[in-house]
């Protein structure tokens, strides 16, 4: 019984990469074709796989309820928080996590650095959704250009670069960097920012900050189910 389950799991994992035929699956698993075919027919009965027009098997809609159950249990705040601490400790910048709520964005998590700023952000602080570095990310992925002060070329550049840096945008003596956090289906889930004194955001330091933010932002996204 256990061996059959292990064989079935192996076949499903192979199908994650795309459709495969019985012979291809048999070769990849070193299983007899009859065994592979029997397992596929069992999966097909549960709508976990389907036989497509190219005469190959692919994952089907039956796997979605299982995935959805897992994905709905994911808490971006809980997943991001330890990485936010790591970013704060490495870069000595305050780290913030924002969610979109209608016409606003709200800070749902913050890890503060020992660099107090005027108008410092607190958990629960609400801002207009399209303002600031985080707002530009939300505007790029969620906004109608008619509702933002962003151009189509700016949005295109942000999608290409994967980050935003602003200096003195919301607070005159502060600067910020924002990166998107994606979830299942590569849907924008949240925006993570760092913020600090504007003097910290020299060209050299921005490169250092960007390397860390992009790497850990993508790590959080992958744990949220994104396929980047």
PLM region spans:
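N-terminal helix-turn-helix
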Residues: 1-74, 218, 222, 226
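Amphipathic alpha-helical effector-binding/dimerization core
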Residues: 58-146
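Juxtadomain coupling helices with adjacent low-complexity linkers
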Residues: 90, 145-161, 172-173, 190-228
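Sensor-regulatory modules in signal-transduction proteins
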Residues: 181-184
């Amino acid at each position: 019984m256990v061996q059959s389950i292990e064989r079935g799991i192996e076949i499903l994992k192979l199908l994650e990469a795309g459709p495969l035929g019985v012979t291809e699956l048999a070769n990849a698993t070193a299983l007899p074709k009859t065994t592979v075919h029997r397992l596929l027919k069992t999966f097909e009965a549960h709508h976990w796989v389907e036989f497509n027009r190219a005469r190959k098997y692919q994952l089907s809609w039956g796997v979605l309820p299982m995935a959805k159950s897992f994905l709905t249990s994911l808490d971006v705040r809980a997943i991001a928080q330890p990485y936010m601490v790591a970013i704060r400790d490495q870069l000595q910048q305050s780290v913030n996590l924002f969610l979109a709520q209608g016409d606003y964005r709200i800070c749902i998590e913050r890890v503060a650095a020992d660099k107090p700023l005027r108008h410092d952000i607190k958990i629960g602080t609400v801002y207009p959704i399209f303002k600031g570095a985080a707002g530009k990310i939300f505007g790029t992925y969620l906004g109608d250009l008619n509702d933002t002060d962003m151009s189509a070329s700016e949005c295109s550049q942000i999608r290409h670069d994967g980050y935003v840096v602003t200096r003195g945008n919301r607070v005159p003596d502060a600067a910020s960097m924002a990166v998107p956090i994606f979830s299942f289906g590569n849907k924008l889930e949240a925006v993570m920012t760092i913020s600090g004194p504007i003097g910290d955001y020299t060209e050299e330091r921005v490169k250092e900050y960007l390397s860390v933010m992009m790497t850990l932002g993508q790590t959080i996204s992958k744990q949220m189910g994104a396929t980047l």
